[in-house]
């Protein structure tokens, strides 16, 4: 029956301590099966302890079932293994045991059984710091006058009755404990259910049941444990069994003497061969002693694999010897030339032999944890391996320091490169920004219509004060009359203060000097501008324009001179003549009068050249 959960274990415990069994007995095969379940750890030890405690508390009213439950507890304690014993010695279960001892006075058989279990636990684990609560409960019961059975005689090793073989705790490692191969995504790790070691797939591909550990289903085991169980099942001869057990022991804990000797010789030959490439030192042939020959003969008789390995190493030694002799003969035939000796390269990295020694030492130390101390101290091969590993500690520290310095240097260089790249990016951004600004200020905005661009500059001369001066028109250049009139009108509009000053200085004639309106006769009007007058007036306008332009270039503001009134009086005539060519509705005809004119009338011709009235000036400005 395969039990893997606490509920299944409860059912099995009820079956072993059934009420149908008389006289407080129990079903012994089922009880042993329960102990195998506890020893194999298929159920957690704490859960197992709670299952037994629950059965004890539930059967407190039935003396027979209570007795069978404690008998089952005694069997499980002595066959359940150390993890289960730790849970039994905890406060949770020991308080229940103390309560039963103090309560059961009528049932002597049950009381004696519980006292016996407690006393055996006290004698076995009273010096254990992890299980010291048993001693506290024992002292408490002694102080209350509880007497324990004195007829119990324990052997020299009181823990022997509780020493049951259990599956070993799993060991974690990053390499196989047999071939020392590193674990990776493809080379997965596997634990042996017997020894708890970690191995690769190649060395843990066997599956067998482990009845001595309470495991009756095939589980994964390593090659060493598989050979051990295979030898137990197929015990053909005592000699074969003894030899294979010796091989397993040597593989697990130390290197055999002959194998260590062969490895040492192979290393010496390889070192001498490497030295011969740089120097002409002869290789001393290895002379095997008689003891070694006898040992080799024994090994050849016992193990064919070891025999093949020895032959292979001897063959390699012979080949190295022949190769060195050939090199020596070729050097003697060639003329002697001074060959430059290569400079020795000091390498701080560990060699393959040192790495193998470290891995082998680590795996052996893990396996030696479960062995007694005297075997560890007496193992000379393990001590030699430890000395070799400790000798390589200085080189390992130096190599680690060298790698750390290189790492720090690379980190510093990476930081400098990132800082330089940031500075370079900042400079590029500044350069691009300056190029964009220069393009904005240097590139002119070309208008879509050049004629509009020209007319805008001509129609807005008031804005030319902030720009370079206009080119002065020569007398022979052609200029339309319409443009001249436009410029004059703009000038009149752009200088309102001048017109206001002109209005202030206008001399208004008295009503006595003006002729009455009744003498004016209305008649059809003639053309306002004859051809000759138009030409004369155009020439006069060009000259006035040139003079006004010259004055505006010299000084942008009007200059107050002595003849300021005369200049002001002349400007409205030009404005009236060209800007507003209006035709009067009727022509003024002056009737002949017999009244003689005064002498000053010839000096001021009012009829022909009359200055504009203030009303006309206001109309012009509007």
Swiss-Prot record:
The modification Phosphoserine is found at residues 157, 495, 613. Changing residue 193 to A: Decreases the association to PtdIns(3)P containing membranes. Residues 462-500 have a biased composition (Polar residues). There is a cross-link at residue 294 (Glycyl lysine isopeptide (Lys-Gly) (interchain with G-Cter in ubiquitin)). Residues 236-260, 317-348, 462-622 are annotated as: Disordered. Residues 533-548 have a biased composition (Acidic residues). It is found in: Endosome membrane. It comes from Saccharomyces cerevisiae (strain ATCC 204508 / S288c). This is Vacuolar protein sorting-associated protein 27. SMART domains: FYVE, UIM, VHS. PANTHER family: VACUOLAR PROTEIN SORTING-ASSOCIATED PROTEIN 27. Component of the ESCRT-0 complex composed of HSE1 and VPS27. Interacts with ENT3 and ENT5, the ESCRT-I subunits VPS23 and VPS28 and with the COPIb subunits SEC27, SEC28 and SEC33. May form a complex composed of VPS27, HSE1 and DOA1. Interacts with DOA1. Interacts with ubiquitin. It is a peripheral membrane protein.
């Amino acid at each position: 029956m395969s039990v893997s959960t606490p509920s299944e274990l409860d059912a099995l415990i009820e079956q072993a301590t059934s009420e149908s069994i008389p006289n407080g007995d129990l079903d012994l095969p089922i009880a042993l099966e329960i102990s195998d379940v506890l020893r194999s750890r298929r159920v957690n030890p704490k859960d197992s302890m709670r299952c037994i405690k629950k059965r004890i508390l539930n059967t407190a009213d039935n003396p027979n079932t209570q007795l069978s439950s404690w008998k089952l507890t005694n069997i499980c304690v002595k066959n359940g293994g150390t993890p289960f014993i730790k849970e039994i010695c905890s406060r949770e279960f020991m308080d229940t045991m103390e309560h039963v001892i103090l309560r059961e006075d009528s049932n002597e058989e049950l009381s004696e059984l519980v006292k016996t279990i407690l006393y055996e636990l006290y004698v076995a684990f009273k010096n254990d710091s992890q299980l010291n609560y048993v001693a506290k409960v024992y002292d408490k019961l002694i102080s209350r006058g509880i007497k324990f059975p004195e007829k119990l005689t324990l052997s020299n090793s009181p823990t022997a009755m509780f020493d049951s073989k259990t599956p070993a705790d799993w060991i974690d490692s990053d390499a196989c404990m047999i071939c020392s191969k590193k674990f990776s995504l493809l080379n997965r790790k596997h634990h042996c259910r017997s020894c708890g070691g970690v191995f690769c797939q190649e060395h843990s591909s066997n599956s067998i049941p482990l009845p001595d550990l309470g495991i009756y289903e095939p589980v994964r085991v390593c090659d060493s444990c598989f050979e051990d169980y295979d030898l137990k099942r197929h015990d053909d001869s005592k000699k074969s069994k003894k030899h294979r057990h010796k091989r397993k022991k040597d593989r697990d804990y130390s290197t055999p003497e002959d194998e260590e000797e062969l490895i040492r010789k192979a290393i010496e030959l390889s070192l001498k061969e490497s030295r011969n490439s740089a120097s002409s030192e002869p290789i001393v042939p290895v002379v095997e002693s008689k003891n070694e020959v006898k040992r080799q003969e024994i090994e050849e008789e016992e193990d064919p694999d070891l025999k093949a390995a020895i032959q292979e190493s001897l063959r390699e030694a012979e080949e190295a010897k022949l190769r060195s002799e050939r090199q020596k003969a070729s050097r003697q035939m060639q003329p002697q030339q001074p060959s430059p000796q290569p400079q020795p390269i000091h390498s701080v990295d560990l060699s393959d032999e040192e790495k193998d020694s470290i891995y082998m030492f680590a795996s052996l130390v893990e396996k030696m944890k479960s062995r007694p101390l005297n075997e560890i101290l007496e193992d000379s091969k393990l001590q030699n391996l430890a000395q070799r590993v400790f000798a390589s500690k200085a080189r390992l520290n130096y190599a680690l320091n060298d790698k750390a310095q290189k790492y720090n240097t690379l980190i510093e260089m990476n930081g400098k490169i990132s800082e330089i790249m940031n500075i370079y990016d900042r400079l590029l951004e500044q350069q691009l920004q300056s190029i964009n600004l220069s393009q904005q200020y240097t590139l002119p905005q070309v208008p879509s219509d050049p004629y509009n661009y020209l007319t805008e500059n001509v129609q807005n001369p008031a804005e030319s004060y902030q720009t370079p001066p206009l080119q002065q028109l020569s007398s022979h250049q052609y200029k339309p009359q319409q443009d001249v009139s436009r410029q004059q009108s703009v000038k009149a509009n752009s200088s309102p203060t001048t017109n206001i000053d002109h209005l202030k200085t206008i001399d208004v004639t008295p009503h006595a000097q003006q002729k009455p309106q009744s003498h004016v006769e209305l008649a059809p009007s003639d053309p306002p501008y004859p051809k000759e007058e138009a030409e004369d007036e155009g020439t006069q306008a060009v000259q006035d324009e040139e003079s006004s332009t010259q004055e505006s270039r010299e000084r942008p503001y009007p200059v107050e001179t002595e003849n300021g009134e005369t200049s002001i009086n002349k400007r409205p005539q030009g404005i009236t003549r060209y800007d507003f060519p209006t035709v009067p509705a009727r022509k003024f005809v002056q009737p002949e009068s017999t009244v003689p004119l005064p002498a000053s009338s010839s000096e001021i011709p009012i009829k022909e050249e009359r200055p504009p009235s203030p009303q006309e000036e206001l109309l012009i400005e509007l």
